[in-house]
Amino acid sequence: MAHVGWPSAHIVGHSYGALVALQMALDSPERVRSVALLEPAARGVSSSAEIAAALEPVIAAYRSGDTARAVDLFLRHVCGDGYRPILDRAVPGAFAEAVAEADLFFQAEMAAVQQFSFGPAEAGHVTQPVLDVTGANSAPRFAEGSELVRSWFPQAEHFVVPEAGHLLMVQNPEALAQRLADFFSRHPIGGVSGPGLVTH
């Protein structure tokens, strides 16, 4: 943000990126005008044990050297079995890119997420407006995550993206963009809606 000359921005984070958005709101509150959390990969939901069990074959595939299978199993877990046509249509080459970056994801990013700690105490230091977003067709664990987020932030706004799952930004971009624009417009930066920064 400093590099491009933005003193502050609206921060949008999806999945693991939503955890980055929360950490940024804690570490640099003067730079964060509002936070939009798109189905954050929140720890501490009631189905955490089931999620861990579902990820075991993913980790096993990666450790065996079958990186493409590991990525496929992971994306099926978070996005549903029908994720590939949706992803290929919106972002050609995205799967191949994910496979190419699998070492970074499995060796660094996933470990960092497991170590990420956020709860009511941390939430108490986040004073910026919060928008909690879920997809209407997402797996139940994301609804659990949404409930957890709203327990941390009782004043948070909630929006359900119709006809969308975890890939909500590519399944229904218009509905999501309209809701984000409305949210940003009601929390202007210096009298204008200001730039937005997206983390994934």
Predicted feature residues:
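Flexible "cap/lid" loop of the alpha/beta hydrolase fold
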Residues: 22-63
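Gly/Ala-rich beta-loop-alpha elbow adjacent to hydrolase catalytic centers
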Residues: 13, 17, 21
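Short beta-strand immediately N-terminal to the catalytic nucleophile in serine-hydrolase-like folds
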Residues: 11-13, 38
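Conserved alpha/beta-hydrolase catalytic His-Asp/Glu region
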Residues: 65-107
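Glycosyltransferase donor-binding loop in the core domain
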Residues: 62, 138, 165-168
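Conserved serine/cysteine hydrolase catalytic core
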Residues: 95-152, 157-160
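Catalytic active-site module of serine/aspartate enzymes centered on a nucleophile-bearing elbow/loop
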Residues: 154-200
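Conserved acidic catalytic loop of the alpha/beta-hydrolase fold
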Residues: 1-9
